[in-house]
Every structure is written in C-alpha cells, then in structure tokens.
Design a protein with these regions (language model features):
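Periplasm-facing N-terminal accessory domains of Gram-negative outer-membrane beta-barrel systems
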Residues: 3-7, 11-134, 208
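Short sequence motifs at beta-strands and strand-loop junctions characteristic
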Residues: 26, 74, 150-152, 169, ...
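Transmembrane beta-barrel architecture of outer-membrane proteins
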Residues: 29-31, 79, 103, 155, ...
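Membrane-embedded beta-strand positions in outer-membrane beta-barrel channels/transporters
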Residues: 33, 48, 69, 105-107, ...
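Periplasmic N-terminal accessory/gating domains of Gram-negative outer-membrane beta-barrel systems
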Residues: 89-111, 115-222, 226, 231-240, ...
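Structural signature of outer-membrane beta-barrel domains
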Residues: 90, 126-128, 182, 193, ...
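Transmembrane beta-barrel wall of Gram-negative outer-membrane proteins
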Residues: 253-282, 292-331, 357-380
Length: 498
C-alpha cells in the first residue's frame, strides 16, 4: 500500500506541476454563458449582465466581450434571475436554473430602447422557489459574513448548525444531523471529506474560502457515500474573471483574550484567476472547558487556502485547491487536574498541574480537470490527497497526568501520534437535455492510517490491585508474580518503568 500511496502523491504533484493552474465547472457548481445581440443579430459589446438569487443572496455582475458573449463560472446549483442592460436598449430579464455542471445557456436579444419608461410588477415569485425536492438549505457569503458564529476555530460547524434545521451542536465543533450521530460528510468542490471535522480530530476548511454552502439534511443523494445523514456541499471562492483585484482584512478582540485576524484577496482575468485567504486565532478558551472557568485552555490556529483557476480553451479548464492548517491547543483542566495537595509518588514533592497538549497539522491538494464534450455534456476528473497528523503530548512530569490518589482520576499517562491520509480519484459525466438531467460517475479512494501510542502507569497502587486469571493477586512483596502484572511492570513509572 505504501507504493500505491507514493505513486498517487507523485501523480498528483505531476498534475499540479504540468498543468499548473485551474478552473470553472466543479462538482458542486456550474456556469451560465450566452450571447447578447441587437435586433439585427449583431453583437452587443459591454452590455451589463447580472445574476442573482434573492433567497441565498448570491449576486454576480459581468460585461459582454467584443463578440457579445458572457460567462459566469463557479455558480452554485440554484435558480437565478438574469438581467441585461445596455445603453440605447430596453432592459431584458429571464430566469436561469443551474442544476448541473453542464453550462446553462441564455440567448439574449435586446430591443431598441424608447423614451417611454415602464415598470412591470409581477405577482409570480416562481424564481424565488426551487423545484428541487431535496430537503436542503442554501447559504451564500452575503449571509455568512453577517452571522455571529460562536467558534472561530470551527466556524463551518457553527455555520451549519445555525442555518440548517434539525442539526444539533455538540462540544468542540462537533455536530449531528437528523437522527444520526456524527454521520456527516463534506463535499468541497466535489472532493469527498467524510472524516470527523471537530477541532479535536481534524482542521476544517476555513470559512473565508467558502463562496456558498448547501446543507442537505434529508437522505443523501446517490452520488454521496460513506455517511448516512447530513451532506454539506461547499463551493469555494474563485478569482476567475476578477479583473480588478478585490480583498478584505478583518481583525477582532474578545473575551478570554481571543485575538483573530485574517485577509482574503481575489484577482485574475478572463481565463485565469487566483483566490487566497489566510487567517489566525489565539485564545485562552480554545476547547469547551469542563469547569465554569476555563483552566489551562489556551490554543491557536493558522489557516492558509489558495484556489487557482485556468481556462485552457473553450472546452478545457483546470482547477486546484490548496489548504494548510495548523492548530495547537491545551487540554482543559478540571479542578482535580490542578493536583492541589497531591504528592509526587517518587520524590514526595508537590505535583504541578496537568499540562497535556495537542497539535494537529492538515494539508489538502485537489486538482480537477473538466472538458466540455458538447453543449449538453461535460466530463470531469479529479484527484485529491488530504492528510491529518495529530500529536498528543503528556505533561512534562508524567505523574501530573494522574496518580490514582484522586477518586475517579487517571492512573496513567500517555502520548499519541496519529496520521490519517485519504487519497483518491473521481470522475463523472453529466448530460443535460431539456428537462432531463443525467449524471454518472464514481470515486476510487483509499485511507492510510498509522497510530502510535505510548503509556506509563503513574499510580503506585495500580499493580497491587490486579489479579491473575485465577483471581489471585499477581503482585506482592514488590515482585510481579503473574500476568497481567508481569506484562505491565515494565510500564510502571513508579517502579522504574519506562
């Protein structure tokens, strides 16, 4: 398996190196394109095209090129209201629905404007209502930028909990969909992420990178596997078509000495684009503490995200997502973990408070190539590698982690080094014709997991309390007499174990 994993990494690196950049239609988004003409059939140059969805708040604007064409890429699946305006012509509007990665087309013919101004009031709100029967919630950045999220280190979890009915919040960024325990999965630009995303297991995708989000709370669609409940489909931001660089910078200070800062910037051209986001957090209440007062609960997190798009031709485009996240945090202490009045079992001196910590590093690389086979069909192939490394560190004095002197307390210390890597390939073919929408595809994925544990017994009374298979004491007179005491004696730190 190690050779297969290395081959996958080399293949991905070659794709990134040779293809370099990336683009348009992805697993969770499509595109809208078309041409604007005047009554004679000539192209209308510099006409303003605007699309919007008043429910999600999504809105985009562009202008037609010299041949009258326009194109919106990275458009989330939803119905949109399209409006066209140009000097000397009457305004034009129509509804366009994006339900597939196959581009949705709009052929616009403008009429010559007159001196008469008219206002049309429509009672029909059909463009505000989706025809998709799936139980889901759509969210755009226009809403996420205003929501008071309770956790900067697990903002996506907080967002999903707030906007999705039936989703229940749990501690430390964990949440549960309808009727299932942690059976949630993410699809980020079509990349499946089905592992736990709470902040004690892994690092989430940064909220700044999300353009739109669709939370499917009912039964998951056929194309999403591994989990049985909530599916969160994420479309990331793109710089494609952003000819004038745009960005923002945010910073905040709050309770528990919480300081956060971040910036995001998008820039590009008609055929390429780059979106980059970086943010960081430092706080004295990183995890949810077991006491009313946060004790030994400091933590920090740093996020880097980069999305690169490149349109090779009218039929081919490439897209790559890069992410790196690092989080370090202390394990919150209870009053008992302060070890007040507890002696060191070896030296007899006072024990310091417990000082257990954790470090999580996450990186993700996901290139995607799309090819438009015809005006009705689109082929997509992508690859991905996501790696999580979790390190758990004990206290410098191992006896501070527990000596057994406190009822119900720990009798051991431990450390852990866990590495989880998901690598895979995915491909799908989408076909749209009139009211018919067909999608066929598959995903080949493998999980590589290594776990290393070390522990030491810190309770001097632990071995004397054990018995052998016959129920007789297996430790007496300072000597291990039988199993399990003979097996555990080398790990007893109170008796020169290591």
């Amino acid at each position: 398996m190690r050779l297969v994993f290395r081959g996958s990494v080399i293949l991905l690196m070659q794709m990134v190196f040779l293809l370099g950049l990336a683009s348009a239609q992805l697993g969770n988004s499509g595109s809208i394109e078309g041409v604007v003409k005047d009554p004679s059939g000539a192209a209308v140059v510099n006409a303003t095209i605007e699309i919007g969805n008043p429910v999600t708040g999504y809105s985009r604007t562009t202008t037609t090129s010299n041949d009258g064409t326009f194109r919106f890429t990275n458009v989330p699946f939803n119905p949109y209201h399209l409006t066209v305006t140009s000097q000397g012509f009457a305004s034009y509007s129509q509804d366009v629905e994006v339900r597939s990665t196959v581009p949705a087309r709009a052929e616009v013919s403008l009429k010559v404007g007159t001196a008469v101004t008219s206002v049309t009031v429509e009672s029909n709100g059909g463009d505000l209502v989706e025809k998709d029967p799936t139980f889901h919630t759509d969210v755009d950045t226009s809403l996420t930028d205003r929501l008071p999220l309770e956790s900067q280190s697990s903002s996506v979890s907080s967002l999903v909990t707030l906007v999705s009915p039936g989703v229940v919040a749990d501690s430390n960024g964990l949440f549960h969909g309808l009727g299932d325990h942690a059976e949630n999965s993410f699809s980020v630009d079509g990349q499946p992420i089905t592992d736990q995303q709470s902040k004690v297991f892994s690092n989430q995708i940064p909220l700044d990178s999300i353009q739109s989000l669709e939370a499917v709370s009912g039964g998951p669609p056929a194309e999403y596997g591994d989990k049985t409940s909530l599916v969160i489909k994420v479309t990331t931001r793109s710089g494609l078509g952003v000819t004038q660089p745009t960005g923002s910078f945010t910073t905040s200070y709050g309770s528990f000495g919480s300081v956060s800062a971040g910036f995001r910037v998008a820039f590009g051209g008609k055929k390429w684009g780059d979106f980059f986001a970086a943010n960081g957090l430092n706080t004295s209440r990183f995890l949810d503490p077991p006491e009313l007062q946060a004790i030994h609960d400091r933590g920090n997190e740093e996020n880097l995200f980069d999305r690169v798009d490149y349109v090779i031709s009218s039929a081919d485009s490439i897209h790559v997502n890069f992410q790196y996240t690092r989080s370090w945090f202390q394990t919150p202490n209870t009053i008992d973990n302060l070890n007040l009045g507890i002696p060191d079992p070896v030296t007899g001196g006072p024990l310091p408070p417990a000082d257990q910590r954790a470090l999580i590093k996450t990186y993700n690389i996901a290139p995607v190539w799309t090819r438009l086979l015809s005006s009705n069909s689109l082929f997509t192939v992508g690859a991905f590698v996501r790696h999580d490394q979790f390190n758990y560190y004990p206290s410098a004095n191992p006896f501070a982690d527990g000596t057994g002197f406190i009822p119900g307390g720990s009798s051991a210390t431990l450390n852990q080094n866990r590495k989880l890597t998901n690598a895979g390939l995915r491909a799908d073919l989408s076909y749209v014709k009139g009211a018919h929408n067909i999608k066929i595809g598959g995903t080949l994925q493998h999980t590589f997991l290594t776990e290393d544990f070390n522990f030491g017994i810190t309770d001097p009374n632990f071995l004397p309390s054990q018995t052998d298979a016959a129920g007789n004491p297996c430790f007496g007179g300072g000597v291990a007499l039988a199993s399990p005491c003979t097996d555990l004696l080398p790990f007893d730190l109170t008796r020169n174990g290591r």
